[in-house]
Amino acid sequence: MSQPLTVECPTCGAPVEWKSDNKYRPFCSDRCKLIDLGAWAAEEHAIPGDTLEDDIFSADLPPREH
């Protein structure tokens, strides 16, 4: 039987076995999982993409043609 895939915990770098019974994967622990969640909530992480436009209000839009 082959050995399970081992990856690094994205938070602390500890080795983590990539197995279906590891409820924290890809993290090594609940603590590392919550640290990562907090970083997303604090907007320390972002998914790259196009810059969002400023809020546009309906009064700023040209009238629609019927």
Curated annotation (Swiss-Prot):
Transmembrane segments: none annotated. InterPro entries: DNA_gyrase_inhibitor_YacG, Znf_NHR/GATA. Its cofactor is Zn(2+). It comes from the Bacteria. One of its GO terms (biological process) is regulation of DNA-templated transcription. Binds 1 zinc ion. Keywords: Metal-binding, Zinc. PANTHER family: DNA GYRASE INHIBITOR YACG. Interacts with GyrB. Inhibits all the catalytic activities of DNA gyrase by preventing its interaction with DNA. Acts by binding directly to the C-terminal domain of GyrB, which probably disrupts DNA binding by the gyrase. Belongs to the DNA gyrase inhibitor YacG family. This is DNA gyrase inhibitor YacG. It comes from Pseudomonas aeruginosa (strain ATCC 15692 / DSM 22644 / CIP 104116 / JCM 14847 / LMG 12228 / 1C / PRS 101 / PAO1).
